[in-house]
């Protein structure tokens, strides 16, 4: 049983008690807890119910209720002696962004609407983004991980050069990074933390989608600490609301680039993004707010209103548009989910 996030509710002699897991003192013979009166043809049963702290949910084969049997073992009618687990809730921010607002871009996140947003400082102090997808794993771009490293650098070489913050500048230690096996085409890497983070209203993973939310005109939110209008990194988390763009128009905009990022003076920003079947574009021509240097690795967050859940539909890969080019480029999350789940399970 994971101790993180778990609370046990005891029903003893007709009274309820909440006990933190890990508490060595569970005295069932406490004089302050009187035994209930006996009843004819009946008996008193000792029960415990496992519950989870806020921002966690119970994962169990049974209902989480355990009875003390004759062998003095706590058992569930379905799960037996197997204990439930408290797993982190994803995509349920306590203070979601106001989706009625009409000001596009440049808004400050004062409420903690993007608790999955992490800040990564790479080698030589460059700020980039990362996205919390569980209480121990984050997604970012492979290019972020390789910043100021040679193309031959290994994951072991990269790991100690990174500094990572979640929530309100909470420093977390990195155990390892895992690069996508085809990261020159699928610009993605995973970061595993040494310890699980405690999920709170300020620190919460975003869900990975099982269905494709990407369609032209669909609106998503991107947050980050990238450069602002003065080309300086901001110390306040900002966010922008952007629609998914027509992929064909995006390809034409970037001069029909279908190859890995390279210098091209005919491109609006002097370089070509990676554009392929694993990517999509988002952005507006009408407004002058956009993602910029340092925002890569952030999620294109979409709210599923039916489920009232936020999903990372994509991860920002090309963050050099900076309101000069019309579109940012994102890696499709649906193309990543199998690899992500397999990698997390193996590691």
UniProtKB/Swiss-Prot annotation:
Tissue spec. comment: Expressed by the liver and secreted in plasma.
Cystine pairs: 52-86, 90-207, 250-281, 292-322
Any GO BP: Notch signaling pathway
Signal sequence segment: 1-18
Domain Peptidase S1 residue range list: 103-345
Subunit annotation: Tetramer of two alpha and two beta chains; disulfide-linked. The hemoglobin/haptoglobin complex is composed of a haptoglobin dimer bound to two hemoglobin alpha-beta dimers. Interacts with CD163. Interacts with ERGIC3.
Entry annotated with the keyword Secreted: yes
Keyword terms of this UniProt record: Acute phase, Antibiotic, Antimicrobial, Antioxidant, Disulfide bond, Glycoprotein, Hemoglobin-binding, Immunity, Secreted, Serine protease homolog, Signal, Sushi
Taxonomic lineage: Eukaryota, Metazoa, Chordata, Craniata, Vertebrata
Sushi domain ranges (all copies): 31-88
Region (Interaction with CD163): 259-264
Written domain comment of the UniProt record: The beta chain mediates most of the interactions with both subunits of hemoglobin, while the alpha chain forms the homodimeric interface.
Gene3D superfamilies: Complement Module, domain 1, Trypsin-like serine proteases
Source species, domain of life: Eukaryota
CDD domains referenced in this protein's UniProt entry, alphabetically: CCP, Tryp_SPc
InterPro entries (alphabetical): Haptoglobin, Peptidase_S1_PA, Peptidase_S1_PA_chymotrypsin, Peptidase_S1A, Sushi/SCR/CCP_sf, Sushi_SCR_CCP_dom, Trypsin_dom
Claim: Cell division is one of the keywords in the record: no
One of the record's GO cellular component terms: extracellular space
Protein name in UniProt: Haptoglobin
Protein family membership: Belongs to the peptidase S1 family.
PANTHER family in alphabetical order: COMPLEMENT COMPONENT 1, S SUBCOMPONENT-RELATED, HAPTOGLOBIN-RELATED PROTEIN
Location(s) in or outside the cell: Secreted
Main subcellular location of this protein, as a coarse class: secreted
């Amino acid at each position: 049983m994971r101790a993180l996030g778990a609370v046990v509710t005891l029903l003893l002699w007709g009274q309820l008690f909440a006990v933190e897991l890990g508490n060595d003192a569970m005295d069932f013979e406490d004089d302050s807890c009187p035994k209930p009166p006996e009843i004819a043809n009946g008996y008193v049963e000792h029960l415990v119910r496992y519950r989870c702290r806020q921002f966690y949910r119970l994962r169990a084969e049974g209902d989480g209720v355990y009875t003390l049997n004759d062998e003095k073992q706590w058992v569930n009618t379905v799960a037996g002696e197997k204990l439930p687990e408290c797993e982190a809730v994803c995509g349920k921010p306590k203070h979601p962004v106001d989706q009625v607002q009409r000001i596009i871009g440049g808004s400050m996140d004062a409420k903690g609407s993007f608790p999955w947003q992490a800040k990564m400082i790479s080698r030589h102090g460059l700020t980039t983004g990362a996205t919390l997808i569980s209480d121990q794993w984050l997604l970012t771009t492979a290019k972020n991980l390789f910043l100021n490293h040679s193309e031959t650098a290994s994951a072991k070489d990269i790991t100690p050069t990174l500094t990572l913050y979640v929530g309100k500048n909470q420093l977390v230690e990195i155990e390892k990074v895992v690069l996508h096996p085809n990261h020159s085409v699928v610009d993605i890497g995973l970061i595993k933390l040494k310890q699980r983070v405690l999920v709170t209203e300020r620190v919460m993973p975003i869900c990975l989608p099982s269905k494709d939310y990407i369609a032209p005109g669909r609106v998503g939110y991107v947050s980050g600490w990238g450069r602002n209008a003065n080309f300086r990194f901001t110390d306040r988390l900002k966010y922008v609301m952007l629609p998914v763009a027509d992929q064909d128009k995006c390809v034409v905009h970037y001069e029909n680039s279908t190859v890995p990022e390279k210098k091209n003076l005919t491109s609006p920003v002097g370089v070509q993004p990676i554009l392929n079947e694993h990517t999509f574009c988002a952005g507006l021509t009408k407004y002058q707010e956009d993602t910029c240097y340092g925002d890569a690795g952030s999620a294109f967050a979409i709210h599923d209103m039916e489920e009232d859940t936020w999903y990372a539909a994509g991860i920002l890969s090309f963050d050099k548009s900076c309101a000069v080019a019309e579109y940012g480029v994102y890696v499709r999350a649906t193309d990543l989910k199998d690899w992500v789940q397999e990698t997390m399970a193996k590691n």
